[in-house]
Amino acid sequence: MATNYIFVTGGVVSSLGKGIAAASLAAILEARGLNVTIMKLDPYINVDPGTMSPTQHGEVFVTQDGAETDLDLGHYERFIRTKMTKRNNFTTGKIYSEVLRKERRGDYLGATIQVIPHITNEIKDRVIAGAQGHDVVIVEVGGTVGDIESLPFLEALRQLAVQVGREHTLFMHLTLVPYIPTAGEVKTKPTQHSVKELLSIGIQPDVLICRSDRMIPPNERAKIALFCNVAERAVISLKDVNSIYQIPALLKSQGLDDFVCERFRLTCPEADLTEWEQVLYKQANPVGEVTIGMVGKYTELPDAYKSVNEALKHAGLTNRLSVSIKYIDSQDVETKGVEVLKGVDGILVPGGFGYRGVEGKIRTAQYARENKIPYLGICLGMQIALIEYARNVAGLTKANSSEFDKDCEQPVVALITEWQDAEGNTEVRTDESDLGGTMRLGAQQCHLVSGSHARELYGKETIEERHRHRYEVNNTLLPQIEKAGLKVTGLSADKKLVEIIEVPNHPWFVACQFHPEFTSTPRDGHPLFAGFVKAAYENHKKSVK
């Protein structure tokens, strides 16, 4: 079967939910038995989002093969079974970097390098490479139509549609249809102008996804179809919903998947959305509730912890609980004290970088340990838990990480100088290494110690989880900390790197060096998050007695 391409663009304003719409359509097509993948093309000049501020860009999602990518790839993996790879996300910066590398190498035989054809050809080549082996590939273009940054991508997709044939391509455009209270009606003019902008660069959309706070009336959909030269059945109303997991059913109810299959002449069974119905049922019928305190430094933008937020919700589904997240700035713990932690049923310290707010996180771990509050530490959340235990229990009063104090006398956490990547190649790092693309990244095996919380939750000896860090537990000082009672319950494949620690004589205190949030899904959840939320609920029941 030839690969079919769905190109997703957005107009009028940003943040309309192109990623969610693309992932939801992919989920329906997957439920029809098709092999689907999704790609994200980002117009910014950064090579990848690895060094971008989380408060500007949101979280960095790490793929199985170690690519640092846009957070939308997290949505893709939560909606479909296909795992994303480095092929599923690339930026303008990465495209230009590769074209310039080829030019320096002489690949273009002295040609004058131009946006057309060299940049557009590189974009097309990457899209085609990422689509290999799939029935349908959905390609989302970041940004808004009309932005100068996205023009090379749109031109490349226009060319690709001609190259592979319009019978194998479909353009889906998301647009805003605002409701004006004073007029008492929705307005279609922004959509018409957005489509006009697309037409000016040679793209005629085949499907319009109309975002609004309400369903678009049939007469307005007919008007949009007429003025935008789109079939009326291809004008889809996408209203605001309580849960993003309602969107697959909402799109299916309007026949979007049927339209796509007919367009590509695909014969496949009806979509079975039973799993999504079960997710929604659990979400709508919780048997209890818990409040999780998330202590971090990027709390002003929840998207900075997008996968953690979603993983907590998934754990709620697994336990039939409603999970409320209380965001706590770690600097507030430093300035206002542990009073800001009162009233939560469990405490989670997610990953992060840099010194700001670290002492607040260390005090948070101490508070959770001493007050028997369920604690889950992720990446930096494990490192600060280790520092706290070393200082206050193991007698290493000057314990710290060399990330925060390069002249630390007792560096219980230090820079990884050498390790093997997924392909077995030796990676070497120093303090002088670039920040971008120089971490321990991607899926790594971990061996679990029997009798531990981790082993009980996972139910197996060897697991695989994704990493994103450049500092590790210092094995030189580890024996003294273990002697004081801390349990190392997870080790890397070569048994040299600490992956999981647990505090004994505590209801639930588990911290891991990897990022379990990246593999949590609404249908399957994740063992560590499920165990953590369950323990938080047990703590909640004690507190209300």
From Swiss-Prot:
Biological or metabolic pathway of the protein: Pyrimidine metabolism; CTP biosynthesis via de novo pathway; CTP from UDP: step 2/2
Pfam family name, one: CTP_synth_N
Any one Gene Ontology BP term: pyrimidine nucleobase biosynthetic process
Regulation: Allosterically activated by GTP, when glutamine is the substrate; GTP has no effect on the reaction when ammonia is the substrate. The allosteric effector GTP functions by stabilizing the protein conformation that binds the tetrahedral intermediate(s) formed during glutamine hydrolysis. Inhibited by the product CTP, via allosteric rather than competitive inhibition.
Binding of ATP, residues: 15-20, 72, 239-241
Active site: 379 (nucleophile), 515, 517
EC primary class: ligase
Binding-site residues, CTP: 14, 147-149, 187-192, 223
Top-level taxon in the UniProt lineage: Bacteria
Name the record gives this protein: CTP synthase
Taxonomy of the source species: Bacteria, Pseudomonadati, Pseudomonadota, Gammaproteobacteria, Pasteurellales
Gene this protein is translated from: pyrG
